[in-house]
From Swiss-Prot:
Domain of life: Eukaryota
Family of this protein: Belongs to the glutaredoxin family.
Name of this protein: Glutaredoxin-like protein ECU08_1380
Pfam families, sorted: Glutaredoxin
Organism the protein comes from: Encephalitozoon cuniculi (strain GB-M1)
Protein task: Has a glutathione-disulfide oxidoreductase activity in the presence of NADPH and glutathione reductase. Reduces low molecular weight disulfides and proteins.
């Protein structure tokens, strides 16, 4: 099982991850959540984070992914909003329930899985000043 999780983490590891031009603060992440249509904070080797990334990828949903591993400010921001990973925001609002909630939304074709044009396009990263 660990080998499978490692392989999935390597495949989905850094796709769509926001690296930005410099060090971002918790306030910067808050601003990013307000600006972005769809954003998810993940742990690279967390099985729920891997499953959520896989689901978004398979359904063609463009969502900004922030890896919190080795990023204390991103981790602190995510943990302040939700106790487990992944931490998912849609239109600036926290979607509670993590991976399980994403599966329910996907099965019901609800946002972000309703093929809204803003969510299925590849969006350029928002660079904060």
């Amino acid at each position: 099982m660990k080998a499978v999780l490692l392989a999935l983490a390597l495949v989905y590891g850094s796709q769509g991850t926001e690296y930005g031009g410099g060090k971002m603060t918790e306030a910067d992440y808050g601003e990013m959540v307000r600006r972005e249509k769809c954003i998810m904070f993940v742990k690279r080797f967390c099985p729920y984070s891997i499953r959520a990334r896989e689901l978004l990828h398979d359904r063609g949903v463009g969502c900004k992914i922030i890896e919190v591993d080795n990023n204390l400010d991103a981790y602190s921001f995510a943990k302040r909003n939700h106790s487990t990973f992944p931490v998912f925001f849609l239109d600036g609002d926290l979607v509670e329930g993590g991976c399980e909630k994403l599966l329910v939304l996907s099965d019901s074709n609800l946002p972000p899985f309703d093929k809204s044009p803003l969510l299925t396009q590849n969006r350029e990263p928002v660079l904060l000043d």
